[in-house]
Amino acid sequence: VAAAGACVAATAAGLPKIEVLATGGTIAGSGASATGSAYQAGKVSVNHLVAAVPQLADIAEITPKQVVQIGSQDMTDDVWLKLNKTINEDCRKFDGFVITHGTDTMEETAYFLNLTLRCKKPVVLVGAMLPSTGLGADGPRNLYNAVLTAAEKKTAEQGVVIAMDN
């Protein structure tokens, strides 16, 4: 995926435009201790998540948007509909979409969007196993790889996808 995404950025007239839609989850989790296991999901803003990965600016033009800040166990039809509406309305403005999401219901969100989106651009869901404040947090690398995946036009041929764990 990294090679494909780098190729997109290198050969395009400009960097691909990717909208990062944040819903919360562990990837946006915050805890009192970097080594502790207790944390609250969905506490870190999308602006902070994007700022934590400055390398994103080398591969895409990022537009962050906070949709909700919840743990994915609290995902609802209303949030799914809001994601659907946002992507369909923003489809002409962006080359792809990344949705940061908790892992509890990530596959349900991907399935719903795959069935209902009219937009035929890449849509990539991404999450993490460790909160953003955790030692060795996997969210930054996962977010980077998700943006690479969303920047690749051929990703759209696969429907809505999930990119995690390198």
Residues of each region from the PLM?
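Active-site histidine-anchored catalytic micro-motif
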Residues: 10-166
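Hydrophobic h-region of N-terminal signal peptides that target proteins for export
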Residues: 2-12
